[in-house]
A protein has these predicted regions:
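Nucleotide-activated chemistry modules centered on ATP-dependent adenylation/adenylyltransferase
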Residues: 1-255
Length: 255
């Protein structure tokens, strides 16, 4: 009989799979989560998510009797960042930030290990997400679809069972704090709430041959923008912000 494995992201849909599996009476052998570390001592998750995962793991162990397996890549983000390119015209050059095309994101690499050959994976696709149903197969099942649980129902289940991630109730980011796909608001909050992480991101920015954003903007560009906001020369909620504003000697938008 194949192993039945829940791939847990700690999001509401993924978490609610536990309730749907229980309701359906489906087998569940293992629960696996892909962990990424920024450095040897700094996790990729913001502190609120680190604490939530610990609490959720304890609840899951107590109620379902299964220990969540945290699988991580053998290398940290920082180690992969400074790893030299092995072949091609850029051989020997530091990799730097991941590209959107040819992304070396560690979470993507770890995720490949979450579905061992011959196993059945449970994934959190809600019943009201038909555009994602093409990801389902005999080996990849959604308990939520089978139980007819919508995204709203998943959230209510998580709230009722004290398993709702802080990403739904606070400004906590659900993902790596250093991800170059995050938006300006998340970067602004990172700089404000975790200056030590922001300082590390600035260091990496100095050492990367690849810009942080695909459009050519760097972490230092965002630092300059946020500094002007701190000084009252730019408004954080400016809907018509343009990067060329940073090049002006005086920002006339304050008048």
């Amino acid at each position: 009989m194949p192993e039945h494995i829940l791939s847990l992201s700690y999001g509401k849909d993924s978490m609610a799979c536990l309730g749907a599996i229980e309701r359906l009476g489906w087998p569940l052998d293992r629960i696996i989560h892909a962990d990424v570390w920024a450095t040897d001592t700094i996790p990729a998750d913001p502190p609120p998510m680190v604490e939530f995962k610990k609490r959720a793991d304890a609840i899951i162990k107590r109620r379902w009797g299964i220990t969540v397996e945290h699988i991580r890549h053998r290398m940290t983000y920082e180690e992969m960042f400074y790893r030299p390119i092995c072949r091609g015209p850029k051989k020997g050059v530091t990799k730097g930030f991941p590209l959107q095309k040819g992304n070396w994101c560690l979470k993507l690499k770890v995720s490949e290990k979450l579905s061992p050959k011959g196993s059945v994976s449970y994934i959190g696709i809600a019943s009201d997400e038909p555009d994602r149903f093409h990801n389902l197969s005999v080996a990849r099942k959604s308990p939520l679809v089978a139980a007819k649980w919508s995204e709203a129902m998943c959230r209510r289940w998580c709230e009722k069972n004290n398993l709702l991630s802080p990403v739904y109730t606070t400004a906590t980011r659900s993902g790596c704090w250093f991800c170059n796909n995050q938006g300006v608001e998340q970067l602004r909050l990172l700089r404000k709430n975790y200056p030590e992480y922001w300082a590390l991101l600035l260091k990496w920015d100095n050492d990367s041959p690849v810009t942080f954003k695909a459009d050519g903007h760097t972490v230092h560009d965002f630092e300059c923008r946020f500094q002007l906001e701190d000084e009252g020369l730019l408004a954080a909620d400016d809907k018509v912000f343009r990067w060329e504003m940073l090049d002006a000697e005086l920002n006339y938008r304050i008048f």
